[in-house]
Each structure stands twice: as structure tokens, then as C-alpha cells.
């Protein structure tokens, strides 16, 4: 939210800001005094659950960005940022990937400096996201698994295990829904939303694949363990363990996929969100 300050400082009385992440909601309300509401995204219904025809073991529908530098390069002194604050926040978050960038700023410099310093953290945050996405994908590839990815951005992925990356042409949202219907496992990596979910989570479930995602408070609180598989982004070996277990045990995979589908189709379609939005508007008007 700090990167869109002009939007939040000019909100009209009565306007509502919908946020996909609970932390963002709190930030906007506390810093800007706006009326922000936690409103997670949802997915597109793509048909009834069907486990037939799943020819793709693992898919990830998302963009790749090469990390600016790695934590090892930072620790060695080979690379760094322009300011002490940026370097200290980068060091704190890479030491504990469960932290949000906002949490690190407050812990190091206090809440009073949060709005000021968050404006300088865009590339710090982006580099952290890009690094952990790269690390997770590379760890899976290094274990011998192949991942189907989509779009030319993945041609920039460099690793000793790149041969296990299957790059397909770019696809749109409707095509992604059909890809999930052909997949056994769909991967999700959050863009450091520690209290939210993505549309991709819902789309994977609605496609009947097992969703494996790095954990957030929202996912832990709104899904059961038999509906989604969660791992710590700083421990990608957990991701490999989960993939290994699911691909070896069709009964387990089918059970989780079907349970996730049922949860998503009843609570996490865009139709569900439209109903919730209309109710929210009614409550605000009343």
C-alpha cells in the first residue's frame, strides 16, 4: 500500500478500499485512516470435479523475474542497497522469511518511520519475492521433478537443473483454468502476502488439482489440512517432501484435491465474492 500513497490519501468519504491481504488492510486503516476491508480474491468455476485426464504432474502459472541478487551475495558483501535501512530490512527478512517487510521496518526503526521507509522498500521487497520463488522452483527441479510453466519470462531462469523446466507458451486466465484440470499438482507462491490468498489458489482448487502454497495466516485459518498443502517459503525442502508424497499416493492426492475443490466451489468462486460485495455495500449504506 505504501507504493500507492496518493490513492489512499485522496479517498472520498464513504469510499471503501478492498484489500486481498489482512496486513494491507490494517496498514491502510492505521496509516491513512481510510475505510479498508479485507476482501480476498476468488477463482473461476471450470466445471465439476473430475480426476481423469490429468497428464501434468506439476504446473505453475505465474511470471518469473530474475532476483537482483541473492542473500549469499549480500552476506559476502558483493551486493547491497543504497541505504542502511534497506540493507537492514533485507537482512532481517531473509533471516526470517515469515516476516513481512512492514514488520521488519517497525521492529528495526519503529512505527513512526513506517510510512517514510516503506516508500524506499519496493525493490527490496521485490528482490526478496523473486529470490524465494526462484529458490523454491530450483529446489523442486533439483529433486528430479519437472515443472510445467507458461510464458517467455521463464526463458530467463538459470539453473543447473533448467532441463527439468518445461516452458510452454503464454496462456490467459481461461486457458489457465483448463491447465489446472489437466494437472495433479498446482503450485502457488505468494508475493509476500502473509495474511491473504491469491486467485491462483482458488483456480487450482476449482480445477481439481492439489494446491501447494507457501503458508499465510488466511490460508491456515480458512482451509483445513486435508484441503490444501502448505509449506514455509524459507524451507523449500518441505515443498519437495509434499510433492513426493502426493505423486506416490494417488489416494491421498485425490482426497486432498476433491476436498479442496468442494471448499473452493462453495466459498471461493467469483460468484461467492459478488454476493459478499453486494452484502458489504448494503451494510455500508445502512
Which residues fall in each region the model found?
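Nucleotide-sugar donor-binding catalytic core of glycosyltransferases
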Residues: 30-194, 216-218
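A conserved, positively charged/aromatic
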Residues: 5-17
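Long, contiguous, compositionally biased segments that the model treats as domain-scale units
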Residues: 1-2
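Catalytic binding pocket for nucleotide-activated donors in carbohydrate/polymer assembly enzymes
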Residues: 22, 26-35, 39, 44, ...
